[in-house]
């Protein structure tokens, strides 16, 4: 199973019995569907305001028959500044232009 760097952001979604509604999704430009579920640490998500972008190590796995991004809850992560996010986004743009 291959882990790779993925930038995610938190948002408020539907509340379920399993969550407070604080969810995470991949940001655009990385080749993942924007509605793809991200399974990651609730403590990480709660540590910053809604809308924060995190750089995580994640892999694609199946959950309930659908692909999702999985990040082990004990993995390190980085809170991205706006400038760091722009740097990552420009790399995605460069690699998509090379295809």
What do the predicted segments below correspond to?
Residues 1-17:
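Structural detector for short beta-strands of small beta-barrel domains
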Residues 15-17, 30-31, 55, 62-65, ...:
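Catalytic phosphate/metal-binding cores of nucleic-acid and nucleotide-processing enzymes, i.e., regions
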Residues 23-28:
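Short, acidic/hydrophobic/Gly-rich beta-strand patch recurrent on exposed beta strands
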Residues 30-40:
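Short, structured beta-strand/loop micro-motifs enriched in basic residues and often containing a Trp
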Residues 41-56:
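Short nucleic-acid-contacting surface segments enriched for D/E, G, S/T with interspersed K/R
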Residues 60-92:
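OB-fold/S1-family single-stranded nucleic acid-binding modules
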